[in-house]
């Protein structure tokens, strides 16, 4: 197990990535864009991200299982329905969409590229360790679920 696995909660990761994006925007040139198109696009993507994340949390709450990303061994049930029919990690998809919306809002291609490092980081240090734990907890049911539903979308 790597020292970073399951250590930094995803919401803190969003703040780190978002801050890095802002810093990059501050030190590199932005792309001239139509503020209306950028505003509408980033707002739509942000709302979509909120819906993904919220539905993921609500499905966990409905099934009375933990949403604590640093302690997946507290999971009490395998949630494989609702939005989890389409993604094994809808909350993280939502968070990724938030970062894309932020990158679009900043109108900076370099900053937007940083958003695409988020799923790489999350897969290595959050999702893969979670999957190991869930496979231990739920066995073949989780293996079958992994075979049917994609990790991201």
Where are these regions (language model features)?
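Membrane-anchoring alpha-helices and their flanking helix-loop junctions
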Residues: 1-81, 93-153
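Histidine-centered phosphotransfer motif of kinases
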Residues: 86-93
